[in-house]
């Protein structure tokens, strides 16, 4: 049998995502979609005559980024009660486009935490079956909320009252193939008739969802704005806290002790200009003003307590945001709340892979794992802003973005020849 060709990336630096320091003069070898070797040049296997060597001098190789809090069908500004401007079929098309944008901008895994009409399931299946090229997708289906709770104006939200209804809703999503369950446990920024820290689910309702999900080996993500509801979520076994706009030191310590993950979505509380550009209503901007400083202080509490931080934006992964994409800006913001650049990279790779349950497959550059790789000019482990200098994206060994001599991308979605990150600013 003919031996498959191996591609060797040589001469650059390598940050493997584990938190270890960069390897200088590194080699990354990729064969049949998997990493064959990742490490120092001295220990690398010898290339065969038929193999390809790619010089990445001046670049740093890293794992593909994760976005653990995405709504690929996001449409702004929010409209009146349960207005569906897409419809389920077109919603899936729009969601795929957003997934493709995420991929070419370095996000190789997307965790969807509340989408309508089965769009996340559709994109996930199409990518897994090889029908379409896209990032790895984890799907939660719609957010499951209390009657009248956070997100009730969303056409696909699933409103429940009582433990039995919440239990049934969680089981229905598992039946569809959900990778996780998302609940709306507290109020938030997007809805007008609620406080950010209002608790909206009763303990028995939370417990019912957690029991169903954990019984099926799945995690529960919870929208959480305030300190009291966060404590209840941690006590009742919720796996990841999403947002945490208001969280004190004691609650952060409780999270750390329980091993609860934190997906801060710092982009949201920095989104004044973004929301104004989208014509968001005054009540959202007023709530945002309340949350801004408190949010960063809350996440600092989490960092100091040793809570595991993961990367997610709430905005589209590829949304243009403060001179880059939302995902990369989120990683930059981590360094403003106490993480070092190396720790911020770990949060967006290894930590996030662990939360998503795919660490055995991806999230770090290690032999045997999927070749989900990005290359950037500079040293992002020292200057996190160098993540903006994206030169290559590889997903499962396929080049989806290639701005290096001698390389050609295998992926060129329609309309992406120029602008690679239109995000919600494109009116679909």
Language-model-derived ranges and their functions:
Residues 91-99, 161-173, 225-229:
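Short, acidic/polar
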Residues 72-91, 100-103, 133, 141, ...:
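Active-site gating loops and adjacent loop-to-helix segments of metal-dependent hydrolytic enzymes
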Residues 59-129, 147-150, 204, 236:
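Metal-associated gating/positioning segment near the N- to mid-region
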Residues 187-297, 310, 315-318, 338-340, ...:
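Active-site core of metal-dependent hydrolases
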Residues 215, 219, 293-379:
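His/Asp/Glu-enriched, well-ordered alpha-helical/loop segment
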Residues 94-120, 134-143, 178-192, 218-219, ...:
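Divalent metal-dependent hydrolysis catalytic cores, especially in the metallo-beta-lactamase
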Residues 42-62, 86-89:
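Active-site metal-binding motif and surrounding structural segment of the metallo-beta-lactamase
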Residues 1-26, 31-32, 36, 41, ...:
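Active-site microenvironment of metallo-dependent hydrolases
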């Amino acid at each position: 049998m003919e031996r498959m060709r191996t591609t060797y990336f040589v001469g650059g630096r390598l940050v493997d995502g584990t938190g270890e320091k960069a390897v200088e003069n590194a080699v990354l070898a990729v064969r049949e979609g998997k990493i064959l070797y990742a490490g120092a040049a001295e220990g690398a296997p010898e290339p065969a005559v038929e193999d390809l060597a790619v010089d990445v001098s001046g670049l740093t190789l890293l794992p593909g980024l994760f976005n653990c809090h995405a709504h690929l069908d996001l449409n702004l500004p929010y409209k009146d009660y349960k207005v569906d401007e897409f419809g389920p079929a077109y919603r899936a098309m729009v969601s795929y486009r957003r997934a493709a944008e995420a991929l070419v901008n370095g996000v190789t895994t997307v965790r969807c935490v509340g989408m309508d009409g089965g769009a996340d399931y559709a994109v996930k299946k199409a990518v897994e079956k090889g029908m379409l090229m896209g990032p790895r997708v984890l799907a939660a289906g719609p957010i499951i909320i209390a009657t009248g709770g956070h997100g009730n104006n969303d056409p696909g939200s699933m409103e429940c009252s009582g433990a039995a209804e919440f239990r049934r809703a969680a089981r229905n999503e598992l039946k569809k193939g959900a990778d996780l369950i998302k609940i709306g446990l507290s109020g938030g920024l997007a809805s007008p008739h609620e406080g950010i820290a209002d608790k909206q689910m009763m303990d028995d309702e939370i417990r019912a969802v957690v029991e169903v999900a954990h019984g099926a080996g799945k995690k529960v993500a919870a929208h959480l704005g305030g300190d009291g509801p966060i404590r209840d979520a941690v006590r009742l076994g919720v796996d990841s806290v999403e947002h945490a706009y208001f969280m004190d030191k004691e609650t952060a310590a409780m999270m750390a002790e329980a091993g609860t993950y934190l997906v801060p979505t710092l982009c949201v509380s920095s989104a004044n200009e973004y929301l104004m550009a989208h014509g968001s209503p005054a009540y959202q901007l007023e709530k945002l003003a309340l949350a801004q400083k408190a949010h960063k202080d809350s996440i600092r509490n989490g960092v100091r307590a040793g809570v595991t931080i993961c990367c997610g934006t709430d905005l589209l992964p590829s949304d243009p945001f403060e001179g880059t994409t939302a995902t990369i800006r989120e990683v930059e913001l981590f360094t403003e709340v106490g993480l070092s650049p190396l720790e911020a990279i770990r949060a967006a790779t290894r930590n996030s892979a662990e939360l998503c349950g795919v660490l055995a497959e991806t999230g770090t550059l290690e032999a045997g794992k999927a070749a989900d790789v990005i290359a950037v000019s500079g040293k992002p482990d020292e200057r996190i802003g160098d993540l903006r200098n994206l030169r290559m994206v590889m997903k499962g060994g396929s080049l989806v973005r290639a701005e290096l001599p001698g390389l050609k991308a295998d992926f060129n979605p329609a309309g992406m020849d120029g602008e690679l990150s239109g995000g919600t600013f494109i009116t679909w």
